[in-house]
Amino acid sequence: MIKGILFDKDGTLIDFYKVWGTAAGPVMDRLLADCHTGEREFLKKELLERLGIHDSEIDPEGAFAWMTYREITDVIWNFLKEKHPELLPEKQELLGKVQNEFYKEVVEKRRDYPVFTEVKELFRKLTEEYGVKVGLATTDTYASARTCMDCLDASGYVTFWGTDDGTLPVKPDGKLVELAAESWYIKPEELLMVGDTPNDMRFAHNGHAFALGVLSGTGKIHHMECVADDLIESVAELPAWLEGKRGEKNGRN
């Protein structure tokens, strides 16, 4: 029986392409601002590709789709070291800049977030009608994730914030599943992880949770079907999926 659900945020609850996909280009422009104008576009294209962004497509196994800010910064730092070592900042300084620039694009400049279903109503239904605990497991920071949930008026239903602030394990470390389960006084096997990337599914399995993939983000069916325990098109189908699971359980009884 499912008693708790961890949601990935980007690509699962909100549209990854419309939020993060549109932010990547402007952020890279600012990070490469000190490079010669004539080569900047070439460097930008190559850097985006190293992050797993190929024109309008985003590789679900690429850095941009699932890595933490620190890991993304490592990719950018190594790229700058290779191409323009004379412009290379301290890694911690670059990390701060990467975080700040993305925060400007995906938080400060936004007044709303494109979603796949009304998140507040989904969380309300899960909490009040299904008696399920709701949490987030995201590689985004707490400040960014909280602002997003506040904007969607859904923060009040979130009782576990698995964010990347340097104090908690990050996906795919299954210890984060264990921490969520402990905080909810349930077993990891009673927890459902909902996400849009193969990394989300590996994370679920590492923590002994059920891995439910959604096809609304970067992971397409050929990426997800071999790693997910089950698949749905988007979180809009989650209540019906849960009803189906309840029916299966009652049928066995």
Each model region followed by its residue ranges:
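Asp-based, Mg2+/Mn2+-dependent phosphohydrolase catalytic module
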Residues: 1-5, 18, 33, 120, ...
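Conserved hydrophobic beta-strand within the GNAT/NAT acetyltransferase core sheet
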Residues: 134-136, 193
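A short, Lys/Arg-enriched amphipathic alpha-helix followed by its capping loop at the start of a domain
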Residues: 122-132
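Conserved phosphate-coupling serine/threonine residues in phosphotransfer and NTP-handling enzymes
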Residues: 12, 138-140
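N-terminal helical cap/lid subdomain that shapes the substrate entry/recognition surface
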Residues: 2-117, 130
